[in-house]
Amino acid sequence: MAKINQSVIAQILKAIGNANNVAQCGNCMTRLRLTLRDSTQVDKVALKQIPNVLGIIESDDQFQIVLGPGKAQAAAEIMNELLNSSTPTAQSKPSDTHLANIASANKKQLKEKQVSAVHKFLTKFATIFTPLIPGFIAVGLLLGFATLLEQITIQGVEHPNTILVEIIGYMKVFSKGMFSFLSILIGYNAQKAFGGSGINGAIIASLFVLSYNPDATSGFYSGISTFFGYSIDPRGNIIGVLIAAILGAWVERQVRKIIPDNLDMILTSAITLLIMGAIAFIFIMPLGSYLFSGMSWLFLHLNGNPFGTAILAGLFLLAVMFGVHQGFVPVYFALMEAQGFNSLFPILAMAGGGQVGAALALYVKAKKDSLLRTQIKGAIIPGLLGIGEPLIYGVTLPRIKPFITACLGGAAGGFFIGLIAYLGLPVGLNTVFGPSGLVALPLMTSNNGIFVGMAVYAAGLVVAYISGFVLTLIFGSKKIEVLKADVQSQKE
């Protein structure tokens, strides 16, 4: 697949109505997220034919172009450079067609319902957590390899090699560093995402990191142990931080409205912090604690129910398609706090296994030298490594039935992981977020050690592969080998 460069982005801009049609450009891990002024200007057929474009997703407030991991950020950076350097063209007289488009857009905006508002809220989580994901993956890999090395070379050894001990300790220290101060990073991103100043969010989040016990032997003592008679208990973890940062952004905007412009820099942040500190100590910390505990309890019990895990794994790709899968991230934090590992992630990762199995079934059924086989050859290796977009948007989703059987294959893998947990052996990721597919193997762990976690996860993938393959072979591979678009591509 071609590398993302200025030429590719120029083609994308042309297909979406040129630079003047782009109001805002951002990205998540796999998608270019655009806010367009007029979505009717998009040439979807031309857009889908551009190299690297795996698919498009339309929502009320965003036009998303699926590019895959490692490409979306580069694409957003190049596009923003082009947008900043482009000169706005003179606005011509509004035509009847243009006025009709404006009317249509206004009508669409007026029809937005609560579902749309919830979707917008959840998509902001991509802005909060996406910049942190490379760090999660990095510390997870280092911790996984360190634990693996520790169990092979040190555990049970009376006099372990000093150099190995130092190496293992060094590889583990990054995980401790990140998770010790992760709340501050999340507070910064959250307040910024919801329209406030990132630094205020970081300062508010730091209140959840500080210690309020003068006799504590660890942590950073804050200098106070009570707040006007209220005992301070910095619980609630990430849920409390998110609530505080989101509310803090709203408070900051309200304060800014009443502060004169010449005093904005001096007073707005100070007043915001004073208000939010009091609210955090009295209300958010206790409330966040209850919400965090409730969420942990719910998903711990759901993760141990095979039918519940089957539903989660089977529906996860739909959440990915609609861009609301980042809403699971606070749950990941809750499970890390409660269990010491993320037991939901391997369940959801089974969805990708079902896609791989379905694609292999289509490959078997497809004619030799067909375009479908060529598409699968290019997408199957990334799929095995946890990059599912090429398979989803290039192979299964356009043909509908294989996508459904792939989801059912993922559900079978989720059922297996849930059944093993129900029998007393839950497994999970050793970090909040990480890669899926085979790449996630070294990051798996359990209460019985890393090897057991890796074995259960690998077995779950095999179940998902086989189930997706068999279900697609029987129910999802009839009369779907060649799409009209494929025929056109072959003629060209």
UniProtKB/Swiss-Prot annotation:
It is found in: Cell inner membrane. The active site is at C28 (phosphocysteine intermediate). Keywords: Cell inner membrane, Cell membrane, Kinase, Membrane, Phosphotransferase system, Sugar transport, Transferase, Transmembrane, Transmembrane helix, Transport. One of its GO terms (biological process) is phosphoenolpyruvate-dependent sugar phosphotransferase system. Its EC number is 2.7.1.192. It holds the Pfam family PTS_EIIB. Its main location: membrane. GO terms for molecular function: kinase activity; protein-N(PI)-phosphohistidine-sugar phosphotransferase activity; protein-phosphocysteine-N-acetylmuramate phosphotransferase system transporter activity. GO terms for cellular component: plasma membrane. The keyword Transport applies. It comes from the Bacteria. Residues 123-487 form the PTS EIIC type-1 domain. Coiled coil: none annotated. It catalyses: N-acetyl-beta-D-muramate(out) + N(pros)-phospho-L-histidyl-[protein] = N-acetyl-beta-D-muramate 6-phosphate(in) + L-histidyl-[protein]. Residues 1-89 form the PTS EIIB type-1 domain. The EIIB domain is phosphorylated by phospho-EIIA on a cysteinyl or histidyl residue, depending on the transported sugar. Then, it transfers the phosphoryl group to the sugar substrate concomitantly with the sugar uptake processed by the EIIC domain. The EIIC domain forms the PTS system translocation channel and contains the specific substrate-binding site. The phosphoenolpyruvate-dependent sugar phosphotransferase system (sugar PTS), a major carbohydrate active transport system, catalyzes the phosphorylation of incoming sugar substrates concomitantly with their translocation across the cell membrane. This system is involved in N-acetylmuramic acid (MurNAc) transport, yielding cytoplasmic MurNAc-6-P. Is also able to take up anhydro-N-acetylmuramic acid (anhMurNAc), but cannot phosphorylate the carbon 6, probably because of the 1,6-anhydro ring. This is PTS system N-acetylmuramic acid-specific EIIBC component. It comes from Photorhabdus laumondii subsp. laumondii (strain DSM 15139 / CIP 105565 / TT01). The lineage of its organism: Bacteria, Pseudomonadati, Pseudomonadota, Gammaproteobacteria, Enterobacterales.
